[in-house]
Amino acid sequence: MRKLTIEDLDVKGKKVLMRVDFNVPLKGGKVADDTRIRAALPTIQYILGKGGRLVLMSHLGRPDGKRVDDMSMRPCLEVLEKQLGRKVFFSDECVGEKAEAAAERLKDGEALLLENLRFHPEEEKNDPGFARKLARLGECYVNDAFGTAHRAHASTEGVTRFFKRSAAGYLMMKELDYLGKVVGTAAKPYMAILGGAKISGKIDVITNLLPKVDKIIIGGGMAFTFLKAQGLEVGSSLVEQDKVDFAGKLLAEGRDKIVLPVDFLVTDTLDIKARQVGGLKEAAAEKIPAGWKGVDIGPKSVERFRDVLKGAKTVVWNGPMGVFEIDKTAQGTFAIAGIMAEITATGATTVIGGGDSAAAIEKAGMAEKVSHVSTGGGASLEFIEGKTLPGVAALTDK
């Protein structure tokens, strides 16, 4: 998949309309985590350094097509100015005369941040009229928002119809490069680690990866549906009854490929909302007591997974191994994060597929010690499923 990149564009003296993903968490009107803003800096700095006139657009939160002051892009402006060490202009509109006038005032090497795209219902509806208004703000288009690439919205897909050339930014290029290896020509041995609560959210991922990988390690709540398919009793652990037959079919197809946990950390009570857990003990996979539920993989499972991953050349990880929101039940997930860092140091390509696993590896302090942490939760998942991402397909082919 060869797409036009930022380096293929001549941006000097031109207005560059760039879609970024500044959908960051806010706390008390301030940016609580600036990871996504930092991720876009290489492309922003490249365009400004080349004398481009940069117009940045993003969404933040879910304002449902109306102006919500608490979801303004203004807190991002403060962070962006600090990180760039220069003034960034702001428009409290993202389309129309006000926004167009602000874009026109830009000089070479200056940047403008537009107000939240989703203050307009037309953005998520991919309205052609709204896309045309956005297109008036630039002479060329760059998409560096991989996290929204799975959405066919006006700023990611519709707008490209009004530009001769639409290019990928550095972050988009990096995502496509690493995730492309995972779904394409991965160096072997190639392993996948899949976790999370439910098998239903990972059906397409498993189906797409099973023929390609050497092993799939299954952890998290979804493991219990597989164990149930093997005829084991799993106490009060989460089981998707309507997926037990499917899990059994996968086990038959995958035979030697699917690796399941052999022990768990189990509890008698769990309240995820209150972040509280009752009594905890270790139990073998086949000996989970009635009334108890698995909330993390156990130490023997960690060692089993470590052995399986030893010598791997490519590993993709999507989904935590347990209830990682609670410290006591996050140790299995943190252990996997540590193993990922270890095998990266021995030369493996390691990719963390966004969402909860990205949050987990950040929390474990291992984000800098793996090859790539995807910035796209749903986007990376759909890419690994083998689906076409509208925001990527819309970019100009080389």
Task: Report the location of each language-model feature.
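Active-site loop-to-helix "anion-binding N-cap" substructures in soluble metabolic enzymes
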Residues: 1-398
